[in-house]
Regions:
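Phosphate- and other anionic-substrate recognition elements at nucleic-acid/protein interfaces
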Residues: 1-28, 32-164
Length: 164
C-alpha cells in the first residue's frame, strides 16, 4: 500500500483508474496554517471550493475531514503534493506525503496524491479575476484545492480515454 504514495505523481495509473467515474471526490491543499478544501459533483464534472480547515491537532483535523467525506459521501480523497518546478520534492512534500499516509490509514476510501505545481498561482489569478479587491488567503487556499481537484479529474479522464 505504501508504494502508492511513492511515485512522483503520487500514484500509478491503475489506482487512478480504480476510482469510479461517478461519486464525489474531496481534495485538500495542505498548507502550514490551514487546509484548502474542494469537492466535485456526483458526475465529476464541476468543482467548488469549501471553507478552509485551520491546522490543529491530527485528531481534530481527521475528525473534520471525516465529517466532510461523510457529508458529501466522497468516493476518494486527493491530497496536493507540492513539488518544485522541476518535479523534485519540495520541503512541504514530505509533510503532504505524511498527511496522505495518515489519512490512508484512517479512512475507508482511496487516498491519492496529485502534483500541485503552480496551483497557488492559478488560484490567486482566479480569485483576483473574480474580485480584484479580494485578498483573502483563505479564498486562495480553497481555490487551490479546487485547481488540484480539477487537475486530478483531467488526469483521470485522460487516462480513461487512453485505456479505452
Amino acid at each position: 500500500m505504501a508504494q502508492e504514495l511513492e511515485t512522483p505523481n503520487g500514484e500509478d495509473s491503475q489506482q487512478i483508474l480504480s476510482i469510479p467515474d461517478s461519486g464525489r471526490i474531496v481534495a485538500i491543499d495542505p498548507g502550514t496554517k490551514r487546509l484548502g478544501i474542494a469537492v466535485c459533483d456526483e458526475m465529476q464534472l464541476t468543482t467548488r471550493p469549501l471553507p478552509i480547515i485551520e491546522r490543529s491537532s491530527w485528531k481534530e483535523l481527521l475528525s473534520r475531514v471525516k465529517l466532510i467525506i461523510s457529508d458529501f459521501d466522497a468516493a476518494a480523497l486527493v491530497i496536493g503534493l507540492p513539488l518544485n518546478s522541476d518535479g523534485t520534492e519540495s520541503k512541504m512534500s514530505a509533510e503532504a506525503r505524511e498527511i496522505a499516509r495518515k489519512f490512508k490509514l484512517s479512512l475507508e476510501i482511496p487516498v491519492l496524491l496529485q502534483d500541485e505545481r503552480v496551483t497557488t498561482y492559478e488560484a490567486r489569478r482566479r480569485v483576483w479575476l473574480s474580485d480584484p479587491r479580494a485578498r483573502s488567503d483563505e479564498l486562495v487556499d480553497s481555490e487551490a484545492a479546487r485547481v488540484i481537484l480539477e487537475d486530478f479529474l483531467d488526469r483521470k479522464r485522460s487516462l480513461r480515454s487512453k485505456n479505452s
